[in-house]
Amino acid sequence: IIYSDKTYDEVKAAFVASPLPSSLKSKLRSFLEIITKPLAVRSSGLFEDSLGQPFAGVYSTYLIPNNHPDFERRVEELENAVRLVWSSIYTDSSKAYFNAIDSMIEEEKMAVIVQEVIGNEYNGKYYPNISGVAQSFNFYPFSYIKPEDGFAVIALGLGAYVVGGEKTHRFCPRYPKLQLASIQDMARDSQKHFYAIDMTNAEYDLVRDGEQAAMKSYDLK
């Protein structure tokens, strides 16, 4: 697969058509018998623990509502999400990144993590009140903030909004009231929409529509 001339769509189709081990299928079924909230299916690769190179966003993460009335359909959706995360090692962007950092893609080993999405459902939309990222070192401190005080970036809704580089609220956790921007600037550059899992659409297609299949953008009004 690594050095073949197959397109990623062909590789993805091969993964989706491949059966999962019976032991894994059994565990996924048992998991779904207990967990009924939306799920995040994401990667946990060896290279993602690398101290030398960032790997955030290189592989795919799939969000699924996990609310289809047919239990077998829920199982199928979860199994496909697992396959698709595994296959995301071989996307064009992943291969290009491995080449850019001069690493061997065949050295990667990946587990897949299945976990509940933190949040609540509001009018058919499932999302957390706050999501964000925090860093322990601030390269652009101001006033009496020190670099080691770090900073955080937060937004309403799913974390895809934050990691996608959209308009967010940035602050220092040690001095949360200290703001560099004026009130006018904050109002102009504030969040205008958010991402949530669409709980009203039970007929989404992960294979066809990718990571965005079950996620929608909603305006803030």
Task: Enumerate the language-model features and the residues they cover.
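Extended, well-ordered alpha-helical scaffold/bundle regions in very large, multi-domain proteins
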Residues: 1-13
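Conserved mixed alpha/beta core segments that line enzyme active sites in large multi-domain catalysts
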Residues: 15-221
